[in-house]
Amino acid sequence: MNNILKRLSIYTREFKYNLKLAYPVMIGMLGHTFVQFIDNVMVGQLGTAELAAISLGNSFVFIAMSIGIGFSQAITPLIAEADGAKKDNDISRIFEHSFVICLTLGIVLFLSVFLNRNLLYSMNQPIEVVKLASPYLFWVSMSLLTIVTFQSFRQFADGLSFTRAAMYSTLVGNAINIILNYFLIFGYWIFP
């Protein structure tokens, strides 16, 4: 019995460290979803057609964003492995390559969503909703470039166990999104 408790105590010592690493990652991942949630809440105040339009646009962007984020997940274990082996040259090489790949993937995903926006018309949605969704889809699809490129930095930092930096930048990004939504959606100050 003592042997089992001893092994369990060795195992549980890592819980605190793992949670310290994991909670910023979880909050950061929720931050990506929170942007679309806030957009839905704020645009929903304009009307049902506007809400339907951004929901339709977000369905396209969510698929592309999931591909970009999923693709970038490979960076973290590669960086962590190189960091654990104290191979600084490998860390820089992995980061440089992952940045270029994520930037390229961001461009490809943006173009894929942007060039296929006419698919909105074949989704049996009211024409009013599609006309509202098309310009929204353009602006939101542009964010794919920054999201996927940001992921290369985020996964790099996560691989080095600096998980809080990405969490803080995601929280700041969400705050900026709320402020800009307020001005751009409702047309306050100098915005139409």
Q: What residue ranges belong to the model's regions?
A:
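Small-residue-rich hydrophobic transmembrane alpha-helices
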Residues: 51-110, 114, 147-166
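Alpha-helical transmembrane segments of multi-pass membrane transporters/permeases
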Residues: 156-183
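Helix-loop interface residues and adjacent transmembrane-helix termini in multi-pass membrane transporters
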Residues: 34-37, 45-48, 82-85, 159-160, ...
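Residue-level signal for short hydrophobic patches within transmembrane helices
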Residues: 15-34, 38, 60-67, 142, ...
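Transmembrane alpha-helix boundary and packing residues in multipass membrane permease domains
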Residues: 25, 29, 41, 77, ...
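Short alpha-helical transmembrane segments in multi-pass integral membrane proteins
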Residues: 1-22, 79-145, 176-179, 191-192
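Interfacial/gating helices of multi-pass transporter permease domains
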Residues: 43-62, 128-132
